[in-house]
Amino acid sequence: MLLCSLTLTLILLAVSGTKCDVKEFCAACSGVPGIPGSPGLPGRDGRDGVKGDPGPPGPIGPPGGMPGSPGHDGLIGPPGPPGERGDKGEPGERGPPGPPAYPDEELQTTLHDIRHQILQLMGALSLQGSMLAVGEKVFSTNGQVVDFDAIRESCARAGGRIAVPKSLEENAAIASLVTKHNTYAYLGLEEGPTAGDFYYLDGAPVNYTNWYPGEPRGRGKEKCVEMYTDGQWNDRSCLQYRLAICEF
């Protein structure tokens, strides 16, 4: 049967004059699909791939074991800045009396000699009418006649201040120096904000006065005080020239 089909085909080809290779004819003919074969054996492992990016951090794990013992103290750091000063504390109890001072005979002798020399000097100056001691005060003058500010400055340089009487006895002592030099003298007083109110140079109110009748009457224009030769006071401008008398 197969042989007859092949023979018939060849005859038809020869008649039509067409050349055909048996191999090409067979390639063009589609056959019936065969039955699928059995699966092959597994292939070999492939090569390692490229390293991937890091993944996100995982969740916190459960607590570990018991905490360990405290470590040793560290090194002491540098001191911090000083804090604000606190409030003043309450005074403490008075302590017991201390031992008596050791009497230094040589020192006592030196002090006695100095005291004696001072008394001699004061006596000599008092005879010249340039210094007088009254109670715990010493009044002294160099005989210069200058304005109020110059007197204040010269007395301060000498360690004193402008003389001002605070009692009748002190007023008389200063008046004797004024009389000796036959000129008026400024006193250590200044007028305050209110006209007619005078104060000591440290700002304290006056506790002794010896005003001339009707004084003071400068009405705020005469800020200083002068002493007359009779010991009475008068308010006066601070720019006048008066005898410089200091107290120590």
Curated annotation (Swiss-Prot):
Q: What does this protein do?
A: In presence of calcium ions, it binds to surfactant phospholipids and contributes to lower the surface tension at the air-liquid interface in the alveoli of the mammalian lung and is essential for normal respiration. Enhances the expression of MYO18A/SP-R210 on alveolar macrophages.
Write out the ranges of the annotated region (Disordered). 34-105
* UniProt keywords, alphabetically: Calcium, Collagen, Disulfide bond, Extracellular matrix, Gaseous exchange, Glycoprotein, Lectin, Metal-binding, Secreted, Signal, Surface film
Q: Which family does it belong to?
A: Belongs to the SFTPA family.
In terms of Pfam families, this protein maps to:
Lectin_C (PF00059)
Q: Name one GO cellular component term.
A: extracellular space
Q: Which residues are glycosylated?
A: 207
> For this UniProt entry, what is the primary localization, expressed as one broad class?
secreted
Query: Which ranges are annotated Pro residues under compositional bias?
Result: 54-65
Q: Which PANTHER family match?
A: PULMONARY SURFACTANT-ASSOCIATED PROTEIN A, PULMONARY SURFACTANT-ASSOCIATED PROTEIN A1
Gene Ontology biological process terms, A to Z: respiratory gaseous exchange by respiratory system
Native species: Equus caballus (Horse)
| Name listed for the protein in its UniProt record | Pulmonary surfactant-associated protein A
Query: How is the subunit organization of this protein annotated in UniProt?
Result: Oligomeric complex of 6 set of homotrimers.
A Gene Ontology molecular function term for this protein is: metal ion binding
Instruction: Fetch the CDD domains from UniProt.
Output: CLECT_collectin_like
According to the entry, every stretch annotated as the C-type lectin domain falls at 134-247
Q: Which domain of life is it from?
A: Eukaryota
Q: Which cysteines are joined by disulfide bonds?
A: 155-246, 224-238
Which residues take part in binding Ca(2+)?
215, 217, 234-235
Quick one: signal sequence residues?
Answer: 1-20
The record's section on Gene3D superfamilies has:
Mannose-Binding Protein A, subunit A (3.10.100.10)
Indicate, by first and last residue, each region the UniProt record lists as having compositional bias (Basic and acidic residues): 84-93
Q: Which residue intervals define the domain Collagen-like in the entry? A: 31-100
